[in-house]
Amino acid sequence: MIELLEKLFSRGPDSSRTQVKRRLQLVIAHDRADLDPQTLEKMRKEILDVVCRYVEIETEGLEFSLESNQRTTALIANLPIRRVKGAIPEWERGDK
């Protein structure tokens, strides 16, 4: 399970201590959020689908993580934007 979470929320190379700390924080946040890995992956894909309608993103710097403090758990998405796409068609905006 931790391997899947690491894959979903991987970051650049770091020291072992920092990686262990992040893993522990991720496990704690995961437990508090009560989300299974499949749900997190589905959320990640849906977020990317929506964002990609409006902007082109740099997949190399893409990062999703769960962060937790004493009161809340947050899903943090770092999505480097290459460029903003053109105008959004009326049918997608919901204009009538």
Curated annotation (Swiss-Prot):
Instruction: State a single Pfam family of this protein.
Output: MinE
Source organism superkingdom: Bacteria
User: Which InterPro entries does this chain map to?
Assistant: MinE, MinE_sf
GO BP terms: namely: cell division; regulation of division septum assembly
Keywords, alphabetical: Cell cycle, Cell division
Q: Which family does it belong to?
A: Belongs to the MinE family.
Q: What does it do?
A: Prevents the cell division inhibition by proteins MinC and MinD at internal division sites while permitting inhibition at polar sites. This ensures cell division at the proper site by restricting the formation of a division septum at the midpoint of the long axis of the cell.
Q: Could you identify this protein by its name? A: Cell division topological specificity factor
Species for this entry = Nostoc punctiforme (strain ATCC 29133 / PCC 73102)
Its gene name is minE
